[in-house]
Amino acid sequence: MKYEKSCGAIVVDDGKVLLVKHNAGHWDFPKGHVEEGETEIETAIREVKEETNIDIKIEKENKYISEYSPKENVMKTVIYFIGEKVGGKDKPQIEEVSDVEWIDVNKAVERITHQRSKKIMMQVIKDMNL
């Protein structure tokens, strides 16, 4: 069994959440693989910047964890943190992302493609009283 770990952030700003549309067609939170020597939080901040051009900070270490098997003999763990926008202008990373959008938190659950991410969004809405 191969194990993979990715980290990302759920960035909420003024009642909207930052989502990316991957080139494969699915909508999700920005995330990516942890690079050698990087902490989980550093990975989340870097991936949001790379995929969306948005700068964020992560102050709380609240984690939302999703585990699934994307293919046979592979188990993937994705760790999301809550990010706060501190700068940058939306711009998709064309190698991986076809669109970047700030979506009203109440509509985000509908827009997100995968059920596991929908559940995380619902939990964030509850936890943050959005």
Where are these regions (language model features)?
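Small-residue-enriched segments and motifs
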Residues: C7, I56-E59
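C-terminal alpha-helix
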Residues: Q123-L130
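N-terminal strand-loop-strand
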Residues: M1-F29
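Unchanged
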Residues: V34-K57, Y64-Q123
